[in-house]
């Protein structure tokens, strides 16, 4: 072997040492975040954006995501095409994330970016800011206090849900937080738990239809996307409405992103992500206000700003 082909051998570390390193680091981090300032349920674009903004301001944030991967639907645009769009002024968020983007050839005020670059850039930004990620972990319920104030979440390993019921006597655990953010997308899972108990006014869930999320011999739906809570697609109305309605839905619970549309019965916006990013920013500011954190305000974008050169 020539000198150019040689390399310094890996350190002499065995299997048990690898296992201990993983277990010790995970346990230490999890213990630190078992009682957090903010728990964000859902690691899609709005949840990650809120996590980034809060962590940058010194807020202790844990993101709970049921999938092995973070990012939700931000990896792809519509129809399995991996280009994502944002409408002005949300391209400013892509600038912040140092994500390349360009103006649409045919539409003024519409910008296109590479989905994997945008999504991975947002994940990295949230992690770099100090937000902690608990993936493969499924939200199952909320923790409540007096007057049903939200005080945390109940969660379990995601694979437990897929096991046959007769062998799944696996109790969940609970973690506490001063504030919970529902960023679970179309499902609005935390909001639904309160709605089921009759303690939350969620107009989008009051007359919830049935069958839209079912796929069997007699029905077809797109699970997680044809939510009965939100209205049909209307890009021009939906994005503004989602940002405007982002905020405190119940004492201790902030709603952001598509969970906002489901909660309030707003139209969906399809494969354009500006509202998801800006809604996450707004949710972070609401959280800062609720927690009375003395920090620099979150910069929610404005169309008065000068767009970046492409």
Swiss-Prot record:
Pathway: Cofactor biosynthesis; thiamine diphosphate biosynthesis
Keyword field contains Flavoprotein: no
Keywords assigned: Iron, Metal-binding, NAD, Thiamine biosynthesis, Transferase
Reaction(s) catalysed by this chain's protein: [ADP-thiazole synthase]-L-cysteine + glycine + NAD(+) = [ADP-thiazole synthase]-dehydroalanine + ADP-5-ethyl-4-methylthiazole-2-carboxylate + nicotinamide + 3 H2O + 2 H(+)
Superkingdom of the source species: Archaea
Region (Disordered): 202-226
Residue numbers binding NAD(+): 46, 65-66, 73, 171, 258
Pfam families for the chain: Thi4 (PF01946)
Compositional bias segments (type: Acidic residues): 205-219
Residues found modified as 2,3-didehydroalanine (Cys): 169
GO biological process, one term: thiazole biosynthetic process
Needed cofactors: Fe(2+)
Keyword check for Metal-binding: yes
Residues binding glycine: 268
Post-translational modification: During the catalytic reaction, a sulfide is transferred from Cys-169 to a reaction intermediate, generating a dehydroalanine residue.
Entry-linked InterPro entries: FAD/NAD-bd_sf, Thi4_fam, Thi4_prok
A GO molecular function held by the record: cysteine-dependent adenosine diphosphate thiazole synthase activity
Binding annotation for Fe cation: 171, 186
Its EC number(s): 2.4.2.60
Main function: Involved in biosynthesis of the thiamine precursor thiazole. Catalyzes the conversion of NAD and glycine to adenosine diphosphate 5-(2-hydroxyethyl)-4-methylthiazole-2-carboxylic acid (ADT), an adenylated thiazole intermediate. The reaction includes an iron-dependent sulfide transfer from a conserved cysteine residue of the protein to a thiazole intermediate. The enzyme can only undergo a single turnover, which suggests it is a suicide enzyme.
Assembly and binders: Homooctamer; tetramer of dimers.
Family listed: Belongs to the THI4 family.
Protein known as: Thiamine thiazole synthase
Provenance organism: Haloarcula marismortui (strain ATCC 43049 / DSM 3752 / JCM 8966 / VKM B-1809)
Gene: thi4
